[in-house]
Structure formats: structure tokens, C-alpha cells
Amino acid sequence: MDTKANLMTYNTFTFKTEAQMLLFRRIWEDNGTALFDKLKKKGCTRFCLNQIWNMKGTFKISVLFEYDSPNAFKQSQIELENFTKNIMKELQAADPVIEASRNIVLQDLKV
């Protein structure tokens, strides 16, 4: 985790089928770099796309964003809303159940 980050969002997306999960993954793989380039300008310090693999029979992806300030979080949310509007049809086809959390970093230990 970036030492400058003091806020983060961690979202888990659960899908009914592997095909839906793979569609969602492709959407982020195709658009994630361009989106992060925009978010960096707003104060987002990290974007991480993950596939959860240790839960047999489930299809899950998680997304982590870290921000350097509360204002960076707010500005990034506006950019994320614009991003999702542009790809809403694809996102709806993936039909994820979303569990979103907003976090304040309390302790961050690293090697």
C-alpha cells in the first residue's frame, strides 16, 4: 500500500457465472489503465484489480483504490461515475452483486 494513502475503497463483485466474471474482468483490463491515468490527476495513488481464487465454486473479483486525501476520494468518485456511464451496458451484462467498503488506513506495516 502506498505510504501516502490515507483512504481506500475496497469493492468485491460476485457473479453468478464464470462468463459474467470474465466479461467484467475484460472491461477493467480494457479500460483500467486509462481510467487510472485520469484518477491519478485527482489524487488516486493506487488501483488494483484482483480475482479471488480461494473460494471454490464462486466467481469473484475485487477492486482496490487508494487516495491521498478525502478530496482526492471525492474527485475520483466523480470520475468513476463518468467511467461507469460510458460502459453501463457492458457492466449490466456482467450483473455483479457489489459489496463496497470505504476505509481509513489505521496501520500499514511493510517489509
Give short role names for the model-derived ranges.
Residues 6-14, 62:
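Active-site-flanking beta-strand signature of metal-NTP-handling nucleotidyl enzymes
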Residues 49-53:
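Short, solvent-exposed loop/turn elements at beta->coil junctions and helix N-caps
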Residues 30-46, 56-57, 64-104, 111:
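An amphipathic, aromatic/His-enriched active-site/gating alpha helix that lines ligand/cofactor pockets
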Residues 16-27:
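Short, surface-exposed ligand-recognition loops at beta-strand->loop->(often short) alpha-helix junctions
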Residues 13-17, 69:
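Beta-strand elements of well-folded, non-transmembrane domains
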Residues 1-7, 54-57:
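Short, flexible turn/loop "capping" segments at secondary-structure junctions
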